[in-house]
């Protein structure tokens, strides 16, 4: 009788005992090291700029207020040159040399060594002034050296000028970065819209 009672109790409570068992949790495999690095590097952005008057530096400040990016300033190797003197005579001669022989490394003015490897980034935003309708010579020097390493990367271009149109600067960028994936519209900051640059930059960034 005792045995019969024990069997009955087990039969009665077995559903309850089964329901209280802890169900093993599914374990999601951790990504391997390579996958983890790919996730961490996704969307990494580099802002490259050259600024003589300070206008492009101000544009970069607006950019970094809106996005997480690393910044690289391009600097001429020769310090203290006044590019604005004598109606921008120095800048004009530098641009003329590049126009004459755009495929000759000797046509481009020397710049200081850079400390960023562009291959580490997925997106590159170039901020440059306009000189005599073209891209400023120091920025052209940088892109002549590094443009081939930007193949397949998303490229954004912001050009600062007083009033001149930027079509030749866009052409310079595409010549120097022939395999870049350019954002459809480049951003033109000029004397008439400069006071509203923060809003213009924010709207432009939404196109990425």
Where are these regions (language model features)?
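Positively charged n-region of N-terminal signal peptides that target proteins for export
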Residues: 1-5
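Hydrophobic helical h-region of N-terminal Sec-dependent signal peptides
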Residues: 6-14
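Glycine-rich phosphate/pyrophosphate-binding loop and the adjoining helix
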Residues: 12, 29, 182-208
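C-terminal motif of bacterial Sec signal peptides marking the signal peptidase cleavage site
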Residues: 16-19
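N-terminal beta1-alpha1-beta2 submodule of the flavodoxin-like/Rossmannoid cofactor-binding fold
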Residues: 21-123, 135, 199-207
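Solvent-exposed loop/turn segments at secondary-structure junctions
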Residues: 52-55, 76-80, 130-134, 161-165, ...
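Structural alpha-beta junctions
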Residues: 66-72, 177-184
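Helix-loop-strand module that forms the ligand-binding subsite of alpha/beta enzymes
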Residues: 89-178
């Amino acid at each position: 009788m005792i045995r019969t009672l024990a069997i009955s109790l087990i039969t009665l409570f077995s559903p309850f005992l089964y329901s209280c068992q802890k169900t093993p949790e599914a374990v999601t495999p951790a990504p391997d090291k390579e996958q983890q690095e790919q996730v961490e590097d996704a969307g990494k952005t580099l802002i490259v700029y050259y600024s003589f008057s300070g206008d492009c530096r101000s544009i970069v400040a607006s950019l970094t207020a809106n996005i997480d990016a690393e910044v690289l300033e391009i600097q001429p190797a020769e310090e203290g040159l006044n590019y604005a003197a004598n109606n921008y005579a120095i800048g004009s001669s530098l641009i003329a040399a590049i126009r004459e022989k755009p495929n000759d490394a000797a046509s481009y003015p020397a710049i200081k060594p850079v400390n960023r490897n562009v291959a580490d980034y997925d997106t590159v935003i170039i901020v440059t002034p306009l000189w005599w309708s073209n891209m400023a010579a120091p920025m052209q020097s940088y892109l002549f050296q590094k443009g081939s390493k930007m193949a397949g990367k998303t490229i954004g271009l912001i050009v600062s000028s007083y009033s001149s149109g930027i079509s030749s600067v866009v052409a310079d960028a595409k010549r120097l970065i022939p395999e870049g994936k350019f954002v459809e519209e480049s951003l033109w900051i000029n004397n008439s819209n400069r006071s509203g640059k923060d809003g213009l930059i924010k709207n432009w960034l939404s196109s990425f």
